[in-house]
Amino acid sequence: MTANAELLQGSLFGDLEPQANAESCSETIARALRNDLSDQELVDESLKRPRNRHNPTSVPSIPLDSESQEQLETADNDNDLPAWAHHNLVDPEQLTPMLRHYVELKAKHPERILLYRLGDFFECFFEDAIQLSRLLELTLTGKEGGKGIGRVPMAGVPHHAAERYCAELIRHGLSVAICDQLETTASKGALLKRDITRVLTPGTVLAEGMLTARRNNWLAAVVVEPAQGNQPFCWGLANADVSTGEFLITQREGSAELHQHLAQLEASELIMAQKIGESSRPEWCPEQLFLTTMATTPFSQPEAERTLLNHYRLSTLDGLGLQEVPLALRAAGGLLTYLRDTQPLAENVDEGIAPMPLEHPLTVFAGDALVLDAQTRRNLELTSTQRDGQFQGSLLWAVDRTLTAMGARCLRRWIEAPLLDSKAIRARQAVVNHLVETRSLRHSLRRFLRPMGDLERLAGRAGAGHAGARELVAIADGIERLPRLAEQLHNALSSAPHWLDNLLTLDKSLPKLAASIREQLINNPPLSLSEGGLMHDNVDPLLDGLRNQLDDQDTWLAGQEIQERKLSGNPNLRLQYHRTFGYFLAVSKAKASMVPDHWIRRQTLANEERFITPDLKTREGQIFQLRARACQREYELFCQLREQVGKQATSIRKAARAVAGLDALVGLAEVAATGDYCCPEIDDSRELQLKTCRHPVVEQLLVERSFIANDVELGKDIDLVVLTGPNASGKSCYLRQIGLIQLLAQVGSWVPAKQARVGIADRIFTRVGAVDDLAAGQSTFMVEMAETANILHHASDRSLVLLDEIGRGTATFDGLSIAWAVSEHLATDLRSRTVFATHYHELNGLSQELTNVANFQVLVEETGDDLVFLHQVAAGGANRSYGIEAARLAGVPNDVVQRARQVLAQLQDDGSSLPALPSAKTINRPS
């Protein structure tokens, strides 16, 4: 590939190397005049003049002028909106060749913003330009479209800032097609070769600036089979994080469970086959999901099998174990097809590397993890707060002490899918226990982890051919830390979870890979891959030969500056370089009239004149050609190195996953050691015994007072606790802390308590508060009843059920009757471990009829008219809710509070009769 002047900006010039046998200046200049040396001549020449290893620089040795960093505009401003607002309005035959090519590409991607590379900018035209200018607040300008057409809308962004602008478009729910230049010099009279190199969608982005570092970016695909006769609604789901290589599939039944699973996954994008007559957004699809539809063919069984076989280069799918999940297999095939259609051209990718390296799909079964429906996740505020969706105030915020992005993602996955296997839980506990007890080891590991890069995503970018030089250096740095981490663990842990083996028995090829990166790349390479300055000297003889030639040219330039100073009699003359205008001789305005006759004026500025000479102009072309060859050779060497790293992406990721898990465990140990936590005793019983337990989030948010700890006992003799007490006394907080401690224990963490015994739960259900669902046409009461029905249909004797009021949104006796019946069913038929907070004090009577029901209350202290909340849970049922006192504390006007007391007294005296309006009370009507 030939490079043009655009590729040549920057320089490989460095300080001249001292030579053992110094040559005369004339000999150096004579050699530099030869710019047509063959590759073999350059290699031979590099052996005669070996280079001392140093970090090459991409900055020209000739000083840059003050304007050299400015971006050149590629179009004139036009304040009038151009007439052609859509590409379909234009006859392509009338367009210029470039715009005709743009329209051809746009026709293939009508639903995407098309960014078309023109020089230093990515440009949009027609409707895309109008949309781009509005969304990103860019100037809408125009470009000549051809004879009889005039100017068409145009807007663009600098190529070096394209990632930032694309990220903003993705956040607006758009996808972007990138058309890049595939060559740097076109044939005479022809356009530069350009094509779509990648398509950016919410689920397929790889660039660091478009991803959230501490959470997965899931792309999901779904295949559904509606219920027919006795056949239930079935679905298969595949979800992949293309940045980390994770690929999971599952197959289950029920549209409600699909909705719940998608809500829990929080995928960035969902792909599905669009069938004729079907709704564009089915009822089971959460409203906030970015939905992409495809043709049905990629989701067919034969096509999906073919796609999987080709992607993983297999002869059979038997080893993947997909026979029992045919719908999930079809979803996986559709997902891989979508990735193939949206990823870059595999120009420099060896046949053995997939353009988008994903691990073999891992089947996730329904019983693999603790089930948390969307309502429970929201009520327990696992990853964001219920009120405003903020991270601070969530459980993850309270326990996340990870030091790496991959560790944070790992901990998030653990919290979203706690374990059911007691053996796996104890394996995590064992590491946490040792790290809590061994403070020096914990702190040492944290020191090693703190500077660790995101190896998981870095390996993915390298495998996909997207990584830059700095990212390869970061990979080398991370790999070099792995043996030291492993050594720390070998000396400390007698037993460890099996997944840590990928760190403890490190792939021996990885240290060699890191050494290869260090040998070739400088420590702080430039961001650009096309301007040189990436590789060390002595990496490649051809590159060394080119650099020697460039050093000779540098010597000539330095000598030319001295020579022209003498000829002009101007000691202040400077030979400089401009990215646009090339090399020139700069003199002040006062000296401009005294320059030699052979100088040619190149540019006039306010304070100086710029000139060239015939020799300088000739030499400039030679320098550009040499620099282009050197830059191209460096890029070729870099691509070879990146390919070498990409082939090891799987090994790097395995080690990275082990580091991520270790980071999560070290963080949990830090929380436990500094937060007065205890190690829970985990077993397969139904018991939940907590001594002086606390809410892990609320205790960190309290500043002026201490958290009041309480006990919990469920599952041994008591299955259901009826919890009564005043409004705002802490009943909801008590319910949530029970659920969070159960969850933390099954993650493998210590818990905020003095002592804990936790029997493994299969599901956690919560019903805490309700609001109208106006979009679905449901009142608060109907929402509450739907949530209650879900619990009663799916809870088992191993479930933990946390209820905060049932039956409030209807008549008192109706609500009480429902609450009583639900409590009876939970205690007798399901025997779920349940805590039911209520203001129906009549429910205290259940304990007299059922031996597995107990009454508890949240204590308050009355001092005159004042009410002090003690936040202490004690045995026995309350007989008052103190609602009026709570209203007064909330700031309800005093006259309303006093009237409420009168009404309450009257109701208590007269039973259920309606209180009369006091005779002294008058009604003020508006005039």
Curated annotation (Swiss-Prot):
Keyword field: ATP-binding, DNA damage, DNA repair, DNA-binding, Nucleotide-binding
Alphabetical list of Pfam families matching this protein: MutS_I, MutS_II, MutS_III, MutS_IV, MutS_V
Region (Disordered) location:
44-80
Q: Which GO terms describe its biological process?
A: mismatch repair
Instruction: Report the record's disulfide bonds.
Output: none
Q: Where is the composition biased (Acidic residues)?
A: 67-79
Domain of life, per the record?
Bacteria
- InterPro entries tied to this protein: DNA_mismatch_repair_MutS, DNA_mismatch_repair_MutS-lik_N, DNA_mismatch_repair_MutS/MSH, DNA_mismatch_repair_MutS_C, DNA_mismatch_repair_MutS_clamp, DNA_mismatch_repair_MutS_core, DNA_mismatch_repair_MutS_N, DNA_mismatch_repair_MutS_sf
Query: Which residues make up the binding site for ATP?
Result: 725-732
Q: Name one GO molecular function term.
A: ATP-dependent DNA damage sensor activity
Query: GO CC: one term?
Result: cytosol
Question: What family is this protein classified in?
Answer: Belongs to the DNA mismatch repair MutS family.
Role = This protein is involved in the repair of mismatches in DNA. It is possible that it carries out the mismatch recognition step. This protein has a weak ATPase activity.
The record's annotation in NCBIfam families points to: mutS1, PRK05399.1
Q: What name has this protein been given in UniProt?
A: DNA mismatch repair protein MutS
Provide the taxonomic classification.
Bacteria, Bacillati, Cyanobacteriota, Cyanophyceae, Synechococcales
Gene (UniProt): mutS
